[in-house]
């Protein structure tokens, strides 16, 4: 089973059973020591796309929003290193829908919604994501660049993943400031089925 390391803010890392290492929205915290096989960037804001933080294995690939959302209304699936990545909607007033994506990952037999920066989307309202019966999903809830905790909780109910994780809880400018990587009060207020709270540095076996 894959292991997830939450690095803080919107950054996290997966290590699969075969050692494949995947970074999602690299920027914050620590844990960039393992060479990357795959780097996922949900959008090009500075706090999600520092792809030079980690060493890379030969053949490392970077999948960006445009790779799975190449045109309006078009979302597609790509595969790399045995991991399937499917683009889904991500947007709000600070994140244009045609520049941002969420990514549904399939790795080591589990499904995981890497939501990116977003508020409630039509993919959530329509039941499209609920129909996937996801194992895990993360939801940003800073209430400034993204939705607040109440809306994130509602989104979690609509998506219906077996486990939901609040992330991106504080507006950030310093990736090394622990106070900007996590907000315990917001995490506690997040209300979702199978809620899991991860602090920076925590690991989760999927």
Task: Give short role names for the model-derived ranges.
Residues 122-203:
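Cap/insert and terminal regions of metallo-dependent hydrolase folds
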Residues 28-67:
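Di-metal (Zn2+ and/or Mg2+/Mn2+) metal-binding site signature of metallo-dependent hydrolases
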Residues 1-34, 38, 67-132, 147, ...:
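Core dinuclear metal-dependent hydrolase active-site scaffold
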Residues 46-50, 68-71, 172-178:
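Short, charged/polar "capping" segments at the starts of alpha-helices
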Residues 1, 58-59, 81-83, 190-194:
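A short helix-to-beta-strand connector/capping loop
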Residues 20, 57-63, 160-163, 191-193:
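A short helix->loop->beta-strand "cap" motif at the edges of active sites that frequently abuts
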Residues 14, 43, 85, 117, ...:
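Divalent metal-coordination and catalytic microenvironments
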């Amino acid at each position: 089973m894959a292991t997830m390391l939450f690095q803080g803010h919107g950054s996290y890392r997966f290590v699969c059973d075969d050692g494949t290492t995947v970074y999602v929205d690299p920027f914050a915290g620590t844990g960039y020591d393992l060479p990357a096989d795959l780097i996922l960037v949900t959008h090009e804001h500075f706090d999600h796309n520092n792809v030079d933080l980690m060493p890379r294995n030969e053949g490392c690939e970077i999948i960006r929003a445009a790779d799975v959302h190449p045109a309006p209304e078009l979302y597609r699936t790509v595969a790399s290193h045995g991991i399937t990545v499917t683009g889904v909607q991500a947007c709000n007033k600070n994140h244009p829908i045609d520049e941002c994506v969420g990514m549904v990952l399939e790795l080591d037999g589990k499904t995981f919604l890497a939501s990116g920066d977003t508020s409630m989307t039509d993919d959530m309202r329509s039941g499209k994501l609920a129909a996937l019966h996801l194992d895990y999903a993360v939801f940003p809830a800073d209430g400034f660049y993204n939705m607040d905790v109440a809306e994130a909780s509602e989104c979690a109910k609509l998506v219906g993943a077996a486990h939901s994780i609040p992330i991106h809880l504080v507006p950030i400018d310093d990736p090394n400031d622990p106070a900007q990587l996590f907000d315990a009060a917001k995490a506690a207020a997040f209300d979702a089925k199978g809620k899991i709270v991860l602090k920076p540095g925590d690991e989760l076996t999927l």
